[in-house]
Amino acid sequence: IGHALAAVAADVLRDPVALIGQEGVDEFGLQAPKVHRGLLISGDRFVSTTAESAALQRELPDALAVEMEGASVAQVCHDYGVPFAAMRTISDRADDAAHGDFARFVAVVASRYSLALVGAWLAGLPAIN
């Protein structure tokens, strides 16, 4: 499931201007968004400083991002033998330079990527009779 989802995501990311507009690309400094496949770690709080980010990188150097919801879903899927893949739109680098308007990022960037990704993923599934 991960490989197929990554391929769909790569297609969705090809033209950020078409998806979110030049204004959104400029506002959030988006440059050549791409898919990263690897380890997501789960936590119970936002990582918002360079010191916190560096400490996590020392402890878990293979981690690509920190998220707060997916681990519980992944555990249930594992327990029941259901395939699972998590997809995240990364809003910042988890450091002191993180932009402050997360709600705007969700509205302008993440929601549009999510809608396009889910739509493309569903369009590629076989029809149910």
Describe the role of every protein-language-model region:
Residues 6, 71-74, 78, 115-119:
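Predominant activation on well-ordered alpha-helical scaffold segments within soluble catalytic domains
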Residues 12-13, 31, 76-82, 121:
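A structural motif corresponding to the C-terminal end of an alpha-helix
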Residues 94-129:
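His/Asp/Glu-rich mid-to-C-terminal helical/loop segments that flank catalytic regions of hydrolases
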Residues 1-5, 33, 49, 66, ...:
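Generic structural signal for well-ordered, non-membrane alpha-helical segments
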Residues 43-102:
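A C-terminal functional module that forms or caps the active site or interfaces directly
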Residues 1-60:
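Mid-sequence, gly/pro-rich, charge-dense loop/helix-turn segments that line enzyme active sites
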